[in-house]
Amino acid sequence: MEILQFIGYGNMAQAILEGAHEILSKRFILEITGRNPEKIAPFLQEKNIQAQIVPYKDAIDIHQKFVFLLFKPYNLKDFNYQGQAKSVLSALAGVGFKALSDAINSLHYLKCMPNVASKFALSSTAVCEKSPMPLISQKALSVIESFGNCVRVGNEELVDASVATNGSALAFLSLVASSLKDAGIREGLNARDSLELVKMSFKGFAKLLEKERPEMIIEQICTPKGATIEGLSVLEKKGVRGAFIKACQKSVKKMRPKNYTLKK
């Protein structure tokens, strides 16, 4: 059986393992390594995840393995990598294929941008590959698909751009949810009821979005001189739409290497 090696044991690694370990353990032997991989042991025990913890000594043995990089981008060169991997799957924000290939020898490289909804196998993940090899590529993509959906984009810059739509986006949506909950409290609902109503609204909205564009949903809710259009006019006047776009732009710019420029 092939080996899938997780290098890193933080929030994203734990989210992916929680959401995908049942599928992945049928296809791979799971390994976890990093500077102090023993830190993940209580989590593995709590979630009943079968994975081998491999202490880091002088080098990480990556030979003939599928290697999933899930640590901080600036730690890429802190490790020594021994051998040639079959595939390197990188969730390192802002780290391009050149930096990856300079640091790690592999037959295949895949750059991806998952999110914390991986813990429910609901991540929306943009991916791009280098040196595509059909059989290796298929297995690497199956890893991504085990914790959500996989959207293949045309180049690595677009993977970084997807932080706007599926990376930082969940934090921005959490701010929206928190604001709506507080609005309910301000109008008289208790905190528990307000949060419950907001949660169900998000579930309903997600279902609507599967079939309809956002603009269509707005049109269905708004009536002439109605309550919703009155509220929307305030949001537009306050520049909320533009603020979201600008926030996403800032997040992408912060993450993207300085030599990344998309053609206009």
Spans of model-derived segments:
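ADP-ribose/adenylate-binding Rossmann-like module
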Residues: Q84-G96
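Short, conserved loop/helix-junction motifs that constitute active-site signature segments
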Residues: L24-S25, N80-A85, D102-N105
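Rossmann-like NAD(P)-binding element
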Residues: Y56-G83, S87
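Internal alpha-helical scaffold of NAD(P)-dependent oxidoreductase catalytic cores
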Residues: L44, A99-Y109, S124-A161, F172-E210, ...
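NAD(P)+-binding Rossmann beta1-loop-alpha1 motif at the extreme N-terminus of oxidoreductases
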Residues: M1-Y56, I62, F66, L122-S123, ...
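Active-site capping/gating segments
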Residues: T33, K111-E129
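NAD(P)-dependent Rossmann-like dehydrogenase/reductase catalytic/cofactor-binding core
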Residues: I16, E196-K264
